[in-house]
């Protein structure tokens, strides 16, 4: 299950989505996330799902690979669904002692589950279709106007990209440690939820040691290549919006317009 997490991973490809300017993809992802928290009806979520489905189809990333990334958050989805369905007051449709299910609770629980699923898939598509270096350059260019007030745009972009890339790396290390300890007789499967959580405590120390080792190796690699931050750094390919990028922006504007019109009508 740990290997199933797709957030932070890059899926190599030459699709139109892969070739888009990273700034366009970053802004589109941010607007998509904001839209998910604004929408409060099924039609709005349907529009968002169609938009995301079109992006996935054009990106040529296998749907099975994307859906696999939802497995690790199934427990969170179920917990959130149960919390909303039983804790929201309103028109009661079922009741047993202190437990009750309301129309408003069911509606909110379904909306929250859809929102989390679309949020995870949409966020994953950014890293799946964008090379780490391109992602760093895109974030830096978007933050570059703030350099005038002393904001270290390149350093912040580098830290954000490294943090994202560390997610699959740490998960892979966790999987290796779990398998190594299971080979030595450790049991992580038996017992209830609390016992399973306690059984995972012994992996924390080797995981932290491994994380610091990876970070040190990365720092030494950057030092050996004379990395000195963003000052006076040049690029082989300067970013410039092309026809495909403007087409993607137009598609994004149409999507946002549909959401705004739908929210006013319904």
Label every PLM stretch briefly:
Residues 41-48, 65-68:
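Short, aromatic-rich membrane-interface segments at the entry and exit
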Residues 1-42, 50-57, 141-151, 155-158, ...:
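Transmembrane alpha-helix interface motif
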Residues 73-186:
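Juxtamembrane/interface alpha-helical elements of multi-pass membrane proteins
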Residues 25, 64-74, 248:
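Alpha-helical transmembrane segments and their helix-start/interface "positive-inside/aromatic belt" motifs
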Residues 51-61, 76-79:
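Alpha-helical transmembrane segments and their membrane-interface exit regions
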Residues 14, 37, 60-65, 96, ...:
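Membrane-helix interfacial "entry" motifs
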Residues 69-77, 113, 117-120, 207, ...:
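Loop-to-transmembrane-helix entry motif
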């Amino acid at each position: 299950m740990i290997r199933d997490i797709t957030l932070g991973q890059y899926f190599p490809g030459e699709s139109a989505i892969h070739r888009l300017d990273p700034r366009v993809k970053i802004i589109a992802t941010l607007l998509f996330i904001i839209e998910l928290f604004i929408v409060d009806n099924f039609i709005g979520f349907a529009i968002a799902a169609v938009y995301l489905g079109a992006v996935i189809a054009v990106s040529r990333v296998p749907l099975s690979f994307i859906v696999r990334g939802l497995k690790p958050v199934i427990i969170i989805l179920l917990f959130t669904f149960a919390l909303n369905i039983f804790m929201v007051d309103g028109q009661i449709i079922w009741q047993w002692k202190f437990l009750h299910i309301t129309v408003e609770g069911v509606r909110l629980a379904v909306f929250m589950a859809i929102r989390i699923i679309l949020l995870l898939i949409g966020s994953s598509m950014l890293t799946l279709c964008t090379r780490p270096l391109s992602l760093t350059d895109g974030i830096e260019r978007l933050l570059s106007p703030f350099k005038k007030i002393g904001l270290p745009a390149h350093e912040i972009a580098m830290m954000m990209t490294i943090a994202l890339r560390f997610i699959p790396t740490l998960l892979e290390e966790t999987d290796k440690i779990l398998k190594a300890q299971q080979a030595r007789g450790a049991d992580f499967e038996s017992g209830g939820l609390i016992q399973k959580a306690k059984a995972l405590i012994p992996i924390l120390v080797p995981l932290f040691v491994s994380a610091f080792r990876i970070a040190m190796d990365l720092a030494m690699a950057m030092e050996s290549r004379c990395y000195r931050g963003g000052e006076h750094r040049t690029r082989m390919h300067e970013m410039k919006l092309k026809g495909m990028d403007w087409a993607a922006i137009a598609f994004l504007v149409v999507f946002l317009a549909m959401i705004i019109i739908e929210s006013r009508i319904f």
